[in-house]
Amino acid sequence: MTLLTPDQLEAQLRQIGAERYHNRHPFHRKLHDGKLDKAQVQAWALNRYYYQARIPAKDATLLARLPTAELRREWRRRIEDHDGTEPGTGGVARWLMLTDGLGLDRDYVESLDGLLPATRFSVDAYVNFVRDQSILAAIASSLTELFSPTIISERVSGMLRHYDFVSEKTLAYFTPRLTQAPRDSDFALAYVREKARTPEQQKEVLGALEFKCSVLWTMLDALDYAYVEGHIPPGAFVP
């Protein structure tokens, strides 16, 4: 590929999101449009918990490699957003409020015993990607947050409208993300616009975002196959 201007690079990143972000997945359309039953929503929340719980570990692997205090301070905030600054705070704790509200046993959720194999493989692949790839690629892989405010708004409004078993309280995880995600993506986008200075680096950045979109899409493929089409693998959560 030829060298892109920063604006051209950003345009291609946004095009990847328009084509590949998981708000386009059929399972998410069903979730937002009220087409799932409570058991299927439970399965989604249970499996998504593993992703939420591993985000701080993913960010910690990158934090350890960042070369400046400025970058580390910025990335440390992401860990605090998810882990909280004291027990019972942060995004992971709020996600457990969602699984509690859906009637799932908290010990069972945290045990990870009911995960779909594809959930575990996909999330672990993402954590390993951030650990093993370049800092530039690792930061670029977080750019799905460019698109998350739209899906969060669709999800919250759709679920509140269609499901009587959720409330604003059980969906409290999503409210802070409406401000946290744009803040984080603004930083990551500015970083890749500045640091991706060669065609090879720009290709790496685009590939990282495509990879992350594939991780999220694959998780929904597995949920759809198991809990919509009815092919639950041995050992996974059975409603």
From Swiss-Prot:
Q: Which UniProt keywords apply?
A: Oxidoreductase, PQQ biosynthesis
Alphabetical list of Pfam families matching this protein: TENA_THI-4
Q: Which organism is it from?
A: Gluconobacter oxydans (strain 621H)
Q: What is the lineage of its organism?
A: Bacteria, Pseudomonadati, Pseudomonadota, Alphaproteobacteria, Acetobacterales
Q: Name one GO molecular function term.
A: pyrroloquinoline-quinone synthase activity
Which SUPFAM superfamilies does the record cross-reference, listed alphabetically?
Answer: Heme oxygenase-like
Provide the catalytic activity annotation: 6-(2-amino-2-carboxyethyl)-7,8-dioxo-1,2,3,4,7,8-hexahydroquinoline-2,4-dicarboxylate + 3 O2 = pyrroloquinoline quinone + 2 H2O2 + 2 H2O + H(+)
Report what the protein is called: Pyrroloquinoline-quinone synthase
- Which Gene3D superfamilies does its entry note? Heme oxygenase-like (1.20.910.10)
What's this protein's function?
Ring cyclization and eight-electron oxidation of 3a-(2-amino-2-carboxyethyl)-4,5-dioxo-4,5,6,7,8,9-hexahydroquinoline-7,9-dicarboxylic-acid to PQQ.
Enzyme Commission identifier(s):
1.3.3.11
Q: Which family does it belong to?
A: Belongs to the PqqC family.
Extract the NCBIfam families matched here: PQQ_syn_pqqC
- From the UniProt record, give the pathway where this protein acts: Cofactor biosynthesis; pyrroloquinoline quinone biosynthesis
